[in-house]
């Protein structure tokens, strides 16, 4: 999947993958990670997600990485946050006192940026990749996370032939097969969310499950 695909999605505001509210699984399960308030939390492919505001409200230092510049700028403007912009290597660094977003390719993000991270949150990153690229992303995420880091992974699963992503379908079997080498995995929840997603109903997708996993980097 080329970067131009995502840039065009944001330019055309075809961002059905963006949630207007804080993810319910984040609200329900984040406290189970038992993190101190000043924890550094990494959010890959963060977009302009309101979930980052929730994490900041818990006292965390949020470190996000997002390919699209428009998404990053919208996050700060939509939430009326004054930020400072600098250049860090190949990435543009937008930051407030508590939130740092690195705009650029996650595959070239320096590991020094996440070396003090002890937690992570992936709601829209794993499901953003087609299956042909997903395992490569999963390995990159693991390489950016120090051993012992804990995180919340949220996925969607549905019959992939019924709808072209993103978001793409990620099954529990895929999670186990491709993440278990690098993470300890605990299933927290799985529920049918089809009724809450009109886009999937309109496309006659027969079922849609959202799942939450607790991951710990080995």
From Swiss-Prot:
UniProt GO molecular function? thiopurine S-methyltransferase activity
Locate the residues binding S-adenosyl-L-methionine. 10, 45, 66, 123
Q: Name one Pfam family in it.
A: TPMT
Catalysed reaction per UniProt? S-adenosyl-L-methionine + a thiopurine = S-adenosyl-L-homocysteine + a thiopurine S-methylether
Q: What is its EC number?
A: 2.1.1.67
Query: Which locations, inside or outside the cell, does it occupy?
Result: Cytoplasm
What does the UniProt keyword field contain?
Cytoplasm, Methyltransferase, S-adenosyl-L-methionine, Transferase
The record ties this protein, via InterPro entries, to: SAM-dependent_MTases_sf (IPR029063), Thiopur_S-MeTfrase_Se/Te_detox (IPR022474), Thiopurine_S-MeTrfase (IPR025835), TPMT (IPR008854)
* UniProt keyword annotation of Coiled coil present: no
Chief localization = cytoplasm
Q: GO CC annotation: what is one?
A: cytoplasm
Sorted alphabetically, the Gene Ontology BP terms of this entry are:
methylation; response to metal ion
User: Which HAMAP family does the record cross-reference, listed alphabetically?
Assistant: Thiopur_methtran
The family note in this entry says: Belongs to the class I-like SAM-binding methyltransferase superfamily. TPMT family.
Name it. Thiopurine S-methyltransferase
- Gene source species: Shewanella baltica (strain OS185)
- Mind giving the lineage of the organism this protein is from? Bacteria, Pseudomonadati, Pseudomonadota, Gammaproteobacteria, Alteromonadales
């Amino acid at each position: 999947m080329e970067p131009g695909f995502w840039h065009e999605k944001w330019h055309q505001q075809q961002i059905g993958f963006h949630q207007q509210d804080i993810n319910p699984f984040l609200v329900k399960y984040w406290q189970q990670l038992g993190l101190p308030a000043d924890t550094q939390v990494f959010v890959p492919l963060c977009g302009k997600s309101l979930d980052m505001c929730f994490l900041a409200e818990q006292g965390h230092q949020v470190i996000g990485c997002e390919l699209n510049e428009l998404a990053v700028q919208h996050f700060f403007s939509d939430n009326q946050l004054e930020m400072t912009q600098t250049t860090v290597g190949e990435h543009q660094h937008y930051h407030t006192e508590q939130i740092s977003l690195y705009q650029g390719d996650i595959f070239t993000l320096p590991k020094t940026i996440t070396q003090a991270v002890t937690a992570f949150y992936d709601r829209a990153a794993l499901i953003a990749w087609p299956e042909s690229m997903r395992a490569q992303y999963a390995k990159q995420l693991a390489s950016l996370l120090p051993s012992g880091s804990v995180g919340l992974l949220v996925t969607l699963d549905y019959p992939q032939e019924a709808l072209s992503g993103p978001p793409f379908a990620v099954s529990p079997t895929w999670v186990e097969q491709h993440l278990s080498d690098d993470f300890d995995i605990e299933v927290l929840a799985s529920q049918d969310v089809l009724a809450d997603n009109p886009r999937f109903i309109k496309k006659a997708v027969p079922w849609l499950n959202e799942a939450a996993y607790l991951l710990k980097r080995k």
